[in-house]
Amino acid sequence: TVGSRVNKGSTFRVELAFPLAEDVPPGDAGSFCSGGNVPDESLPLGDLVGQRVLVVEDNELNQYVILNMLARFGVETCVAENGRDAVDRYAEDQDFDVILMDVQMPVMNGYDATRRIRESGLPRCRSVPILAMTAHAMRGDEERSFAAGMNAHLTKPIDVRELVFSLSRWGSAARRNRK
């Protein structure tokens, strides 16, 4: 259906009938990652179990996708809907192994939120891994993430393998340093 109002805008609604996808059993996360050049056996999924990750993402659909992905890997998550919320949540609880930070959000963007966390003086503010999770994939975007104080730059749509290896690398190191 299509609807349009002068000086108000247009709305378009499309309905498509698709069969429901099969659920992936919780213990079968490796098959969820199948495909690509990396064999499933090489994915360090065990490193992710029990990690605490702060997901900073304003888009509800993106939240749903990343939270479900992380849940399949046994990752505990907390959500912040914008950069200001992320700074506030970190001020309340610094016990995160990784922060996955979208960069383009309302209220406060991810670059500014990262700078605020890094400069906060809170425990682990300089060492907690902050990984950009963004659609910004142009030349210079990765450098901008690093300049803001982020440790890595993951582009959307998120590649499951890259996410797993990044969380294994950064989250495992953060856990070792906290103990």
Regions found by a protein language model. Name each.
Residues 1-179:
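C-terminal compact regulatory domains
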